[in-house]
């Protein structure tokens, strides 16, 4: 039963990899994505993946504050139609300044988060490739051993007096 579990995990990972590759292929073959990737902005972001990932994280994280800001703008515009023009200017100014502060903070947070996510992706992918590699057991121990192995002669020489 213990031998069947790693094979099951490996098979599940292969199925997941096939599904993800099909999803990525369907996304990359979309006509709008192809048109964007041929544009200068798409080519620049393709050559700078960290910047593209940071931009994606920033856009996702800034959706809620921008939505709240637009809601406040619409509500104050409706209030202005009722005669509260000075209040609208004040609220939009304060809201715009608040949005600027929030978006600057989200920019720094998204930069830090994308850096941590990419670093954790590199670490996890290297650990997974080390743990689940299809190499024989003898090769796997030598290539993924994080502690250096000491020869027995060196070990005995350390403790002789």
UniProtKB/Swiss-Prot annotation:
<feature type="topological domain" description="Cytoplasmic">
    <location>
        <begin position="88"/>
        <end position="93"/>
    </location>
</feature>
<keyword id="KW-0812">Transmembrane</keyword>
<keyword id="KW-0472">Membrane</keyword>
<comment type="function">
    <text>Plays an important role in the formation of lipid droplets (LD) which are storage organelles at the center of lipid and energy homeostasis. In association with BSCL2/seipin, defines the sites of LD formation in the endoplasmic reticulum.</text>
</comment>
<feature type="transmembrane region" description="Helical">
    <location>
        <begin position="44"/>
        <end position="61"/>
    </location>
</feature>
<feature type="topological domain" description="Cytoplasmic">
    <location>
        <begin position="134"/>
        <end position="161"/>
    </location>
</feature>
<dbReference type="InterPro" id="IPR029709">
    <property type="entry name" value="LDAF1"/>
</dbReference>
<feature type="topological domain" description="Cytoplasmic">
    <location>
        <begin position="1"/>
        <end position="43"/>
    </location>
</feature>
<comment type="subunit">
    <text>Interacts with isoform 1 and isoform 3 of BSCL2/seipin to form an oligomeric complex.</text>
</comment>
<keyword id="KW-1133">Transmembrane helix</keyword>
<feature type="transmembrane region" description="Helical">
    <location>
        <begin position="68"/>
        <end position="87"/>
    </location>
</feature>
<dbReference type="GO" id="GO:0005789">
    <property type="term" value="C:endoplasmic reticulum membrane"/>
</dbReference>
<comment type="similarity">
    <text>Belongs to the LDAF1 family.</text>
</comment>
<dbReference type="GO" id="GO:0005811">
    <property type="term" value="C:lipid droplet"/>
</dbReference>
<feature type="transmembrane region" description="Helical">
    <location>
        <begin position="117"/>
        <end position="133"/>
    </location>
</feature>
<protein>
    <recommendedName>
        <fullName>Lipid droplet assembly factor 1</fullName>
    </recommendedName>
</protein>
<keyword id="KW-0256">Endoplasmic reticulum</keyword>
<dbReference type="GO" id="GO:0140042">
    <property type="term" value="P:lipid droplet formation"/>
</dbReference>
<feature type="topological domain" description="Lumenal">
    <location>
        <begin position="111"/>
        <end position="116"/>
    </location>
</feature>
<keyword id="KW-0551">Lipid droplet</keyword>
<feature type="transmembrane region" description="Helical">
    <location>
        <begin position="94"/>
        <end position="110"/>
    </location>
</feature>
<feature type="topological domain" description="Lumenal">
    <location>
        <begin position="62"/>
        <end position="67"/>
    </location>
</feature>
<dbReference type="Pfam" id="PF16015">
    <property type="entry name" value="Promethin"/>
</dbReference>
């Amino acid at each position: 039963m213990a031998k069947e579990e790693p094979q099951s995990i490996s098979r599940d990972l292969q199925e997941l990899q096939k599904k993800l590759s099909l999803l990525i292929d369907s996304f990359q073959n979309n006509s709008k994505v192809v048109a964007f990737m041929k544009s200068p902005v798409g080519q620049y972001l393709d050559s700078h993946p960290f910047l593209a990932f940071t931009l994606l994280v920033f856009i996702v994280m800034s959706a809620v504050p921008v939505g709240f800001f637009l809601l406040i703008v619409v509500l104050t515009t409706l209030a202005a139609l009722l005669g509260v023009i000075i209040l609208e200017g004040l609220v939009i100014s304060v809201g715009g300044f608040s949005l600027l502060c929030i978006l600057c903070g989200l920019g720094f947070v998204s930069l830090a988060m994308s850096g941590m996510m990419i670093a954790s992706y590199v670490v996890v992918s290297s650990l997974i490739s080390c743990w689940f590699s299809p190499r024989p057991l003898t090769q796997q121990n030598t290539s993924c051993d994080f502690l250096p192995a000491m020869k027995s002669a060196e070990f005995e020489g350390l403790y002789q007096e």
